[in-house]
């Protein structure tokens, strides 16, 4: 048998990009054993407790249910992630077949995700007035659905980056006209999304006219894997991925801008 064995880093983006990388070579193997890297959980996520471990197992079970994947708990495998790909080439994830179901709403809408990772808060503050004005005008044409956290719980990993790098823009967009607020009350950095809410949010993104994200965190990774996505991202630990897959690419489904005006123009033209 030709067998590949890998552990996966536990960030949402890491899991999605690892899945895409492994999918790109899966026809070369009889079996691909995948395991969560629980050392990452112990170091950065342990305050989330058992519910987060259960959520990770659910996500692995959903994404790696087909052949040649075999779920494992073995911790001796080499670890891969979005930033440490081993010998694999970065590939854009596509998770629509795993999470897209019937429409949640029977009218057109645009999703705005509230969590930001990577783009410094001062850059969002420079963008905020134009961004809110653009969305206010857009709300005359589409409902605006808010997804994500109202308040980001600062776990051990987030504290390393700080609240100027990982934060929520909820207070900036919560009072937009024609808003449908599906944000989470809980601080997901120190709790865990429920399976029901996670699947609902992904399906909501999938059927949106577009999903808007700031930064390069899990919300962008999920959106770009399942929806038409308009993003603004400057700096951040995901820039390697953005540069390789999205910046200056002819991808009709995902745009990532560093120019605030260009970003807002894309939104205005929806």
Tell me what each language-model feature is:
Residues 5, 111-113, 213-216:
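Structural motif
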Residues 12-19, 129-242:
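Donor-binding and catalytic core of enzymes assembling or modifying cell-surface/extracellular glycoconjugates
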Residues 10-13, 40-41, 116-127, 152-153, ...:
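Short acidic, S/G/P-rich loop/turn micro-motifs used as interaction or catalytic elements
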Residues 63-116:
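A nucleotide-sugar donor-handling region in carbohydrate enzymes
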Residues 221-270:
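Nucleotide-sugar donor-binding patch of glycosyltransferase catalytic domains
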Residues 36-37, 110-118, 147-150, 235:
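Short loop/turn segments at strand-loop or loop-helix junctions that form parts
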Residues 39-46, 52-54, 119-121, 151-160, ...:
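Short, charged/polar "capping" segments at the starts of alpha-helices
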Residues 1-78, 202-205, 220-221:
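Active-site and donor-binding regions of nucleotide-sugar-utilizing enzymes
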């Amino acid at each position: 048998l030709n067998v590949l064995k890998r552990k996966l880093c536990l960030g949402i983006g890491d899991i999605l990009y690892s899945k895409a990388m492994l999918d790109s070579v899966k026809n070369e193997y009889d079996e691909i054993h995948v395991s969560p890297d629980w050392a990452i959980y112990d170091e950065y996520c342990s305050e989330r407790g058992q519910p987060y471990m259960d959520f990770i197992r659910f996500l692995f079970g959903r994404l790696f249910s087909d052949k040649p994947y075999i779920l494992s708990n073995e911790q001796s495998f080499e670890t891969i992630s979005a930033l440490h790909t081993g010998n694999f080439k970065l590939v854009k994830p596509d998770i629509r077949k795993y999470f897209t179901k019937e429409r949640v709403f029977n009218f057109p809408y645009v999703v705005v995700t509230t969590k930001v990772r990577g783009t410094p808060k001062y850059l969002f503050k420079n963008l905020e007035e134009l961004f809110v004005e653009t969305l206010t005008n857009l709300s005359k044409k589409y409902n605006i659905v808010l997804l994500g956290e109202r308040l980001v719980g600062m776990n051990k990993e987030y504290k390393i980056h700080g609240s100027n790098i990982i934060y929520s823009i909820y207070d900036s967009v919560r009072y937009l006209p024609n808003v449908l607020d599906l944000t989470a009350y809980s601080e997901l950095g120190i709790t865990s999304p429920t399976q029901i809410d996670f699947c609902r949010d992904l399906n909501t993104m999938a059927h949106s006219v577009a999903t808007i994200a700031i930064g390069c965190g899990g919300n962008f990774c999920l959106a770009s894997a399942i929806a038409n996505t308009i993003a603004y991202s400057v700096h951040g630990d995901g820039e390697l991925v953005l540069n390789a897959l999205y910046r200056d690419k002819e991808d009709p489904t995902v745009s990532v801008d560093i120019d605030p005006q260009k970003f807002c123009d894309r939104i205005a033209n929806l």
